[in-house]
Amino acid sequence: MARTKNAGVPLAAEVVSQTINDEVVVASAAEVDSEATNLISNDDRADSDEETEALQPLKMYFGPSDYTKPFKITAKCYLHKAVGLLESHLEESELKWFLEHPQFKHFFHMHKDPNHKVMGMWLLFIRTTCLDKKGSMVYCQWRTDPMFGPGATIQYPDVEKKLLSMKKPSEARLRVVVLYFLCNRWKGVVADLELCKTFPWGKNAFEENYLAFEAIPVLRKNFCEDIESADPQCPRMCKMKFKSSTMKGFPMSDVYDKLGTTKSILAPTPDENLLLKRIMDKECGVNDVDDLIADGWKKRLVDEERTICFEPLFNEDVAHQSFVANNAPSTVVQAPRKAAVEKKGKGKTAAALTSPSDEGLTEVVNEMKNLMENGFKSMNKRMTNFSKKYEEQDKRLKLMETAIKSIQSSTGTDDAYGSKEIDDRENELEEGSDANGGDNEREVREKETEIDKEVAQGDNEREVGEKETEIDKEVGQGDSDIFDGNKDMELNKEVAESTIGVAESEKDKEVTESEKDKEVAESEIGVPESEKDIEVADSEKDKEVPQDDEMDGGKVTEPSKKRGKSHDDGDDPSEGCVKKPKVVKKVAKSRTDAKPVYRSPIQTRYARKKTKKNV
């Protein structure tokens, strides 16, 4: 275990050697091999010649080859696993030793959370050096323990296995328990149990250092909470815990959102100021050994506030931390140094130290060249394959284009031939229609007359059926006489109105005899229909006359029917009206004369044809 009070010497919390020893041996300067020191280089140059030069240490506690990873500070500890195993396997007397320990007891009664680990309890630094000065460095060396065999390399699973195999409580078992407890955190004083009690295990490293969740009020408020049942004499780690969450940890995005632009942290308390003064003050030198290396570092770092950089050690450390690709030898990266640095105010220059890693750089460059060449070769192969594929696709596209053009040309010629044939057929039909125009018109007229006959027959049959049903209804009525009288009055009025219309139509029709002759010729086809209509109208009773008028729609043939019925019944339509006798005479003439009689069915025929089309 290494520890220092000098600000320029880092804390150490881990030992590379994992063998066990019965004694604790403190190394001295005489035991350290005397080796020639390397050249020293400092970042800053003093304004005067009296500046203190930092000396390179004779030996580093951990060699460069012991660590292959870059510098890292860990902040996670799985305390709940070790504490749970000890509580379940130890006897009361053995467990009492931990519960009464001034530092270890807090691990057993603090809040145990498997997700949120205890952070910042101690710092792990890789680089530590061997010094003889008191208060600057404490470290332990071990010899092989007889329990694990001579020369055995002990690992963490071996310690756990050894602990579980020891069933009876004893001092040896307690030592193994202490070793198991410290394997994850400290590898140090195990043989001397009294020394474990008096040694300041992380006291200054924890009690006098604040975490971000403790120092920044915003983070403490949002992510931490106090434990009410904690002992007031316990340190902070027993009085605080992280808030429960559905996740194993807090995402950094949440931390950044809560933090925002906060720059406020806890100011140092008076006790902390006294502590800093006590740590940074000069040692009294009682029972102490002067160390030029430690004193030179302290004076340069604290008094002169300068930095120290040992370039050879830096290059050696980086060389062992570089990655290994494809089992290639590790390469060396030079430290970023200037070729020459001028002293302030004097203009003097100091030549830069030559780096021993030039060969490593050449190897890196050669490897990069080989990788680039191989990559470009593979890219060229792929590009050639792609070009071949594209050429094949171009050929296929050209073939498809030619096929599509041929299809389009063939379809265009077929359409031209088809349109010509259609035009020829239409011309032939037009010529035939012009030659046989009269025949076609006659055929059309004959078809129209046949259709009119069929329509007239259907209408007559429907009218006869409707009239019969109405007659049956009227026969059952008791007031048939009154109903007949009313019907006669209505018929007289309608006859008078219809005769006026007939007279006007006859005047218009008698304008030219040539037109009448043409109309008579056209109406000859409809004579049988008109005669049938007249006979049906004469054979019906007087009660059915209004219904005939309604069914026929007030056509020209209805007045003649109504007028004939009125004469047959003996009623004179001229009664009560001066103009009626003249109309009767005209009607009588129209009855004897065939011209007006033959004209009326033509109008009814065209009227029925229109109604049929509308339907």
Swiss-Prot record:
UniProt-listed Pfam families: DUF287 (PF03384)
Biased composition (Basic residues): 579-589, 606-615
UniProt keyword terms in alphabetical order: Phosphoprotein
Stored InterPro entries: DUF287
Keyword Phosphoprotein set for record: yes
Compositional bias per record (Basic and acidic residues), positions renumbered to this chain: 439-476, 484-496, 504-521, 529-561
Ranges for region Disordered: 424-615
Residues the record lists as Phosphoserine modifications: S48
Protein name, per record: Uncharacterized protein At3g43530
Organism: Arabidopsis thaliana (Mouse-ear cress)
